[in-house]
Structure formats: structure tokens, C-alpha cells
């Protein structure tokens, strides 16, 4: 055991649709630590840009938008909800128009810079689990625990399709699969904080594992690094 009775960061990175958010939420709920969905933060920025007809090439307008934007995550009777400038946008940030643009928005340097700064501030003085694309490599390179999740594109598209169906969001499987492949290419080849495994991260291919099995494997690694029960 390396760290006792102290604040720590559990960084969960990986490809879109690998179960990062669900895993992070479950860990946070089970062990009473703070959960931060960094992907939803970028989705909020994307939605705000769309609502204000701002293109990703309009850097000055994006910067001005970021100066006034307010992103909050609240827990409403056990359900995580996201507020954009005081309005509940939990469902809107999962719409197709956001899905199609969020990867590009997250590659805009000024957006990445502002969101990383915000994530670091929100994590100060806390025991926290964060998931995203570059938590262990860029946001918190010294995180006590680093996990990297992968899965086949087909399995990830299937999971996203079923999640959307539960939320009443109707997007065809083929369209989701195309978006997953597109995002993989964008995320891994980005000039700004590309998706990659940290050298000291534990990598797990979740394709053939249930969520419960993934959680069990990951938690065994977490407990090697921190006393999460403290």
C-alpha cells in the first residue's frame, strides 16, 4: 500500500464507449469519493457552441464563450445531472449533433486548456475518480492510480446503442459504430492531448468482460495503490 489517509486521483482513460463513465460512477458511489465526468464537460461546451452558432474555427468567439460558461454536475436523487448555465442539459449533451462535434471541439487548444484548468481546480483537496481521454497523461500525470480501458469498436457501439435506448435516444447502431471509429481516429491522432496509454497505466480490454468483472479487476489494482476505504 503506497498511500494512506490522503487525497488521491484515480485516472480512468480509454476509448469512447469502453465503460469508463459507468465504472467511475460505480467506484465513486460505492466508496464515497468524488466522480468527475470530463467528457460531459466537453459536451456542455459543444452544446453551448451549437446553441450560439459558433464554429470550431471561430477561436475568439469560443474564448469569449468560455469566459462566461458555467458547467455544473449535480446529484438528483441518485442520478447525475449536468447543468449548463443553470439549465439541465443531461439529455441534450447526448444528442447526435453533439456526438458529431464533441471530438473536434475537445481538440481546440483553448477549450482543452480551460477544461484542464477547471478539472485540476475541482480536484484539489479531494479523493476523486476522473475519466476521460488524457487524465493520466496530461491532466494528472502524477495520479496515484492510472487505468486504461479498451474494447472492440463493435462492442463499444453496441453498448452505446443500448445506453441510448434506455435514455430514449434513438440513434441507429450503424451510425453509432461509424461515430466510434471516427472518434478513435480523431482522438488518437489529435495534435492536442492525443488518446494514449500512460506508461504506468494498467490496461484492460473490456470486450469480453461484464461491467461487474471489469470493476472487480480494476478495484484489485486500485487497492494495490491506495486505501480507498479510508
Description of each model-found segment:
Residues 39, 86, 115, 129, ...:
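Residue-level signal for inorganic ion chemistry
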Residues 90-102, 106-166:
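ATP-dependent NMP and nucleoside kinases share a basic, alpha-helical "lid"
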Residues 15:
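P-loop (Walker A) phosphate-binding loop of NTP-binding proteins
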Residues 20:
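Conserved lysine of the Walker
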Residues 30-95:
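N-terminal phosphate/diphosphate-binding loop that engages ATP/GTP or pyrophosphate donors
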Residues 23:
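Hydrophobic positions on the alpha1 helix immediately C-terminal to the Walker A/P-loop
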Residues 10-12:
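Hydrophobic anchor at the beta1->P-loop junction of P-loop NTPases
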Residues 74, 119-126, 133, 137-138, ...:
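Small-molecule kinase domains that catalyze NTP-dependent phosphoryl transfer to phosphate-bearing small molecules
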